[in-house]
């Protein structure tokens, strides 16, 4: 008998013991009353600032690395300098860990339209909140990359502005698949780390939730930087594209929106309807009310 059955079933056949956790009620599709709540706007501001900081630190790291490894600027030993791909991956994963930890109690710490979209599909956030979050994240990303350009104007355009592009030798299908799988890993980790069922049984999990999320971002970057520069976050991609505003940045830009949203949708379906058996529970509820 599986662990879930031990915890949730018992006694005579067909009888179920009280669950040791409580699933939050699904968020309404449209909650007009939410628009009059200060907590919503506070959360939107938190998402804006968090995404701004995320893009500033990470894109600055990318530009700095490319400058340090540019032989024409840093000498013959440039190839041995810089933080390397590992350092870039740590910058992205580390900033997500820090910012999710700081904002989780205010906005949920999404910092990514794909995460927001996945949580919306799972009825964790309302449509109104999801739209405002995504707008705030995109604006924050644009401002964050704008700061990088302001502070590193001599190198920003020279080194590509941190924009996501499909690397030479890879097809559009490969790039799209990399973004789908990478975002699936991230959003699946978000669902698992914030699962109320897990939180109820492991009291330390809520405190550590930002850690696996940040580590997932780190691992995905190691795998996909050579392919797409790693998007998995439409705000990150559009922020760099808008400020760099080069034809190369916009070419195949759709990959960095379609891929993350598809990956997030698959992760939401997998976690909610397969792992958490949402479809079976809904069918059981329908039969009991029939």
UniProtKB/Swiss-Prot annotation:
GO molecular function list: water channel activity
Swiss-Prot/TrEMBL induction comment: Down-regulated by chilling.
Record has Cell membrane as a keyword: yes
Cellular-component GO terms for this entry: plasma membrane
UniProt xrefs under InterPro entries: Aquaporin-like (IPR023271), Aquaporin_transptr (IPR034294), MIP (IPR000425), MIP_CS (IPR022357)
UniProt topology in membrane: Multi-pass membrane protein
Protein name as it appears in the record: Probable aquaporin PIP2-1
Record keyword Translocase present: no
UniProt record similarity statement: Belongs to the MIP/aquaporin (TC 1.A.8) family. PIP (TC 1.A.8.11) subfamily.
A matching Pfam family: MIP
Summary of the tissues where the protein is detected: Expressed in roots, leaves and anthers.
Keywords associated with the record: Cell membrane, Membrane, Repeat, Transmembrane, Transmembrane helix, Transport
Domain notes: Aquaporins contain two tandem repeats each containing three membrane-spanning domains and a pore-forming loop with the signature motif Asn-Pro-Ala (NPA).
Main localization, broad class: membrane
The protein's role, per its UniProt record: Aquaporins facilitate the transport of water and small neutral solutes across cell membranes.
Source superkingdom: Eukaryota
Entry's localization field: Cell membrane
Species assigned in the record: Oryza sativa subsp. japonica
Location of the motif NPA 1: 112-114
NCBIfam families linked to this entry: MIP (TIGR00861)
Renumbered ranges of motif NPA 2: 233-235
Annotated transmembrane regions: 43-63, 80-100, 131-151, 173-193, 207-227, 255-275
